[in-house]
């Protein structure tokens, strides 16, 4: 399903340009080669599918320029999941490279979704997580990649705030929840919410809220993500987060401006984890964003 992605000419709409600048700048992103993120996964969605309880810790390592990502440990302490492209393939390997299981075109293997009876196998869970996290960690810069259509739509009022919105259509070459998604930004141009409807869960509409934007190696990433059901009126049911994602650390590997060597964008041993000035103080994950 996926092919290599490289940077194209970005949509220069005023909102997208400001969002890119607020998240670290497109010119700086052009030098990024890879990212590594420590993630804690939770929520009742996973146990419903027969998977481990909340608190699963994963490390995601991804190529910033094409959809290639590894997640680990996965299923066993010495195993990792690898999503690659050309052709699209998901494999589970040991950390020393021994193949355990592999599937071409993993997306086509998902069964019809029924929350009461559906169970996913390891390949399917790994694919869902891998495709999601590659997109989460490369956005909003991946909005400038070839084949991605971006336009500003009418604003949205929520919680006494007005959020500007980008409607983004991803190409079929991008492994993602679904093609058409909407992203909501506050007055600091920080992402507050994203709406989509994953094809592999019967296009169930969700509202994915992001909290606590932090700066790591010069780029801004949400530290907390909470995913809720969304009604036909666009209102999210925030009484329960079906999926929770917490990002403890992101390390950005970038090429220096002189192009002489690959190294971190920053010379610091530890990434900059300063709270972004536009971050919302949210102590209860059920509190409306």
Explain the meaning of each model-derived region:
Residues 2, 6-8, 21-103, 152:
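N-terminal mature ectodomain segment of secretory-pathway/periplasmic proteins
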Residues 74-120, 235-262:
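Catalytic loop of the DD-peptidase/beta-lactamase superfamily, centered on the K-T-G motif
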């Amino acid at each position: 399903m996926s092919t290599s992605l490289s940077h194209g000419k970005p949509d220069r709409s005023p909102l997208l340009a400001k969002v890119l600048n607020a998240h670290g700048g497109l010119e700086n992103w052009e030098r990024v080669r890879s990212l590594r993120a420590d993630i804690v996964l939770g929520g009742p969605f996973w146990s419903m599918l027969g998977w481990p309880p909340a608190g699963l810790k994963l490390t995601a390592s991804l190529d910033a320029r094409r959809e290639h990502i590894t997640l680990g440990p996965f299923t066993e302490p010495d195993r990792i999941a690898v999503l690659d492209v050309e052709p699209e393939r998901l494999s589970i390997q040991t950390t020393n490279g021994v193949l355990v299981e592999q599937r071409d075109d993993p997306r086509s293997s998902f069964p019809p979704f029924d929350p009461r009876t559906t169970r996913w196998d390891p390949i399917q869970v790994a694919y869902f997580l891998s495709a999601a996290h590659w997109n989460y960690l490369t956005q909003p810069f991946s909005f400038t990649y070839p084949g991605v259509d971006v336009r500003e739509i009418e604003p949205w009022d929520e919680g006494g705030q007005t959020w500007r919105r980008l409607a983004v259509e991803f190409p079929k070459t991008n492994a993602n929840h679904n093609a058409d998604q909407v992203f909501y930004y506050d007055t600091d141009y920080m992402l507050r919410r994203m709406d989509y409807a994953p094809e592999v869960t019967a296009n169930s509409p969700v509202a994915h809220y992001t909290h606590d934007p932090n700066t790591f190696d010069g780029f801004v990433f949400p530290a907390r993500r909470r995913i809720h059901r969304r009604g036909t009126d666009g209102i999210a049911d925030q009484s329960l987060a079906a999926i929770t994602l917490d990002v403890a650390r992101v390390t950005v590997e970038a090429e220096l401006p002189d192009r002489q060597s690959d190294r971190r964008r920053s010379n610091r041993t530890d990434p900059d984890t300063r709270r972004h000035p536009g971050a919302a103080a949210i102590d209860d994950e059920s509190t409306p964003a």
